[in-house]
């Protein structure tokens, strides 16, 4: 997968390219990450990348020419079929279903805004989609871009040891994840649920499903409204509700 990043702070993305699962994906050539700094496309000795907004007001906007040239350079390297995304508070909120959609693309370009944002005409002519990671304001698009990359990279074949890890994570099936346990068997008087050590795979599956449904109902009940539950899930959920009322 190719991901181009238009950013004034390419050094920040070492967190993606050099560490953890995404860093390993880069080393294995499963994920290619390229940064394009608008400063490298300026024409003045000061490498100016901001400009005043028409109409006045506080703050500055990213200068059109360097930003547009950086986007064009990213598009040229990516080639045909690339999707350009602008990280923006006005964008579609990133949820697991959206991550799954974005993971279907083999080429993405992420535009990271700074200052008060970018010229609306660039959004109209250069950007395919706007995405947001939440209803709050950050100082730039770099952290949202890193969040998106980390989430999407998990679906690249070979990035995770087992694809089931991505498929079974919280939200992947619309439910919160079940509790997990490892050694020791007892920790500060707390023990591992016996069913997990029983070796009975069907009982373990049912226990995990029950835990996921219970956690989702108690912590994020609105998620259940979006799901088409199976008959088994409905039965388990009704039992959970009857036992907790």
From Swiss-Prot:
Biological source species: Actinobacillus succinogenes (strain ATCC 55618 / DSM 22257 / CCUG 43843 / 130Z)
Keywords: Cytoplasm, Methyltransferase, S-adenosyl-L-methionine, Transferase, tRNA processing
Source taxon at top rank: Bacteria
An annotated GO cellular component: cytosol
Positions with a binding annotation for S-adenosyl-L-methionine: 113, 133-138
Top EC class for this record: transferase
One record GO biological process: tRNA N1-guanine methylation
Complex formation: Homodimer.
MF annotations from Gene Ontology: tRNA (guanine(37)-N1)-methyltransferase activity
Protein name (record): tRNA (guanine-N(1)-)-methyltransferase
